[in-house]
């Protein structure tokens, strides 16, 4: 029997996070086991909740006037090690690391989020985000599962 082991690039980058969230789901039968493909799918506009996707699309329309938004480059795969890809973002108010891992043997996909807040005031206003993140992440993983497995909705 295998011994349980937990490791993530997200927790290796931020060793003392102020907030963490872990989501695990089943790897669909015909889906890719490439963690970078999962990371790209997870942070694509198709996987985001509709309200966030519309806000980002509206911001993209303003590019000509305001210049490209920083998040266009922020949510790109920065590193791949073994069965996990890392998406990193360093912001003015927080540092974010998201490790997207695919365990092909166990047929699992895991998403580990680690956040370091910069300043006490940021921790206070982050409570709504903390409360919503599990639900948002479940939806993002579900949409990515459907996209990467080739399942279409009727």
List each language-model region with its residue ranges.
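Hydrophobic ligand-binding cavity/cleft-lining segments
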Residues: 1-61
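Intrinsic-disorder/low-complexity, polar/charged segments enriched in Ser/Thr/Lys/Arg/Asp/Glu/Gln
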Residues: 18-24, 84, 108-110
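Short C-terminal domain-edge/linker segments immediately following a structured domain
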Residues: 54-58, 117-118, 140-147
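Hydrophobic-ligand binding "helix-grip"
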Residues: 67-105
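Beta-strand/loop substructures that line and gate deep hydrophobic ligand-binding cavities in soluble
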Residues: 92-131
């Amino acid at each position: 029997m295998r011994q349980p082991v937990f490791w993530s690039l997200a927790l290796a980058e931020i060793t003392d996070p102020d907030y963490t969230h872990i989501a695990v789901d089943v790897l669909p039968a015909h889906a890719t086991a490439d963690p970078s493909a999962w990371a790209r799918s997870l942070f694509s506009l198709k996987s985001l909740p509709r309200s966030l996707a519309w806000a980002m699309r509206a911001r993209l329309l303003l590019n000509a006037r305001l210049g490209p938004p920083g998040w266009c480059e922020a949510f790109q795969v920065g590193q791949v090690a073994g069965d996990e890809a890392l998406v990193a973002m360093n912001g003015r108010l927080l540092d974010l690391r998201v490790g997207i891992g695919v365990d092909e043997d166990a047929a699992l996909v895991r998403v580990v989020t680690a956040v370091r807040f910069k300043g006490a005031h940021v921790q206070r206003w982050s409570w709504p985000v903390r409360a919503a993140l599990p639900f948002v992440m479940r939806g993002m993983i579900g949409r990515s599962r459907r996209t990467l497995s080739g399942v279409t909705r009727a």
